[in-house]
Regions:
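N-terminal Rossmann-like dinucleotide-binding module
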Residues: 1-49
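Predominantly a Rossmann-like dinucleotide-binding segment in NAD(P)-dependent oxidoreductases
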Residues: 13, 127-227, 352
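Conserved SAM-binding strand-loop segment of SAM-dependent methyltransferases
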Residues: 52-58
Length: 358
């Protein structure tokens, strides 16, 4: 069955990830493009669309097209909830870019709309589809590491602040590196541990390097006056079964321990980490061992105009679930928990107190 797709938001993540991936799937036609900058929509349509692809400035007009099966939401975070709910109510299946939403309440509205309409909803956590992630998930699912009681979610950059668009705008995005890249690392860690029941969260956020002049940023200097979100954030997460997760995220941090969209796991039978390729370690025959797993591991940067493998695998899995009426690989219920924890870290950082879950 051919799938007709509409794209809402034709910026960097659409052109770098969603569109090149969808364009490689034989059963997909990208038939509609929407952006408040109509020229961006026209350019995307010319590059990736069908011959008769339509362009819009108003996403509500796109949603009126009853021939569209699937909509991808590739807009700033503050728009995710309303656009997703409206798309679901317009009888479309929806892939929404990460994070699911700015707040737990918004994410819950999205989940409720999916259940109410019977349409499929997934969130763009493409790092689950990397080769190393898939391998490690098989390891944890088999129980090779035993009971995983400690995890670290890594999302640290030294100087890689996205200083374009609305990334530095608190009102539009809901936060900085925690909600931008910390969300990927936390999603991976929860997925590997298969644990979605937080009990308590404590967090800290910092506005330190963001308020200083800088010339070493990967994308050029930022303006401290425009930097309204945190430059780094850290969380301590206690799960209901006693397991503990430490989440570290930064766009700018004076640290050489730089890793992004990675996790480390410690279990009763062994441990694993993604910090130097993929390593599995433990104790055997009275000795300690470390196994280096050789895999083709690609990067996570979608701003160089190239499609990496995990983006294509994510798109294929998503389209397949729509065609075959199977659950999405990234379930909205899981993404909701990620949003709950991120929101709790921000709240704890603001109040100085722990946040407890029922």
């Amino acid at each position: 069955m051919g799938i007709k797709v509409g794209i809402i938001g034709c910026g960097g993540i659409a052109n770098g990830k969603h569109l090149p991936s969808l364009a490689q799937i034989d059963d997909v036609e990208i038939v509609a493009f929407c952006d408040i900058d109509i020229e961006k929509a026209k350019t995307a349509a010319t590059t990736f669309g069908t011959v008769n692809a339509k362009v819009y400035q108003d996403y509500q007009e796109l949603l009126k097209d009853q021939t569209i099966d699937v909509v991808h939401i590739c807009t700033p975070n503050y728009l995710h909830c309303d656009m997703t709910v409206h798309a679901l109510e317009a009888n479309k299946h929806v892939m929404c870019e990460k994070p699911m939403a700015k707040t737990t309440a918004e994410a819950q509205q999205m989940l409720d709309a999916a259940k109410r309409t019977g349409k499929k909803l997934t969130i763009g956590y493409q790092n689950r589809f990397r080769v190393d992630s898939q391998f490690l998930h098989q390891v944890t699912a088999r129980g090779d590491l035993g009971d995983i009681y400690f995890g670290k979610a890594h999302a640290i950059r030294r100087r890689a602040v996205p200083n374009w668009g609305v990334f530095l705008d608190e009102e539009a995005q809901g936060g900085g590196p925690l909600i931008d890249i910390g969300t990927h690392a936390l999603d991976l860690t929860l997925w590997m541990m298969n644990n979605y029941e937080p009990a308590a969260v404590m967090g800290s956020t910092f506005h330190q390097l963001s308020q200083q002049e800088n010339a070493a940023n990967a994308w050029g200097p930022w303006n401290p006056k425009d930097f309204t979100v945190e430059d780094s954030a850290f969380g301590f997460i206690k799960m209901k079964n006693g397991a503990t997760i430490i989440l570290e995220s930064a766009w700018a941090l004076n640290s050489l321990d730089v890793d992004e969209a990675k996790c480390s796991l410690s279990g009763t039978k062994g441990g694993a980490d993604m910090k130097d390729g993929l390593r599995i370690h433990g104790e055997e025959l009275g000795t300690l061992y470390t196994k280096h797993i050789e895999l083709d591991n690609k990067g996570v940067d979608f701003y160089e105009g190239e499609t990496v493998d995990e983006a294509l695998e994510e798109a294929k899995a998503w389209i397949s679930c729509v065609q075959n009426n199977t659950p999405p690989r990234v379930k909205p219920e899981e993404a909701l928990v990620v949003t709950q924890i991120l929101e709790a870290i921000y709240e704890s950082a603001h109040t100085g107190k722990a946040v407890y879950f029922d």
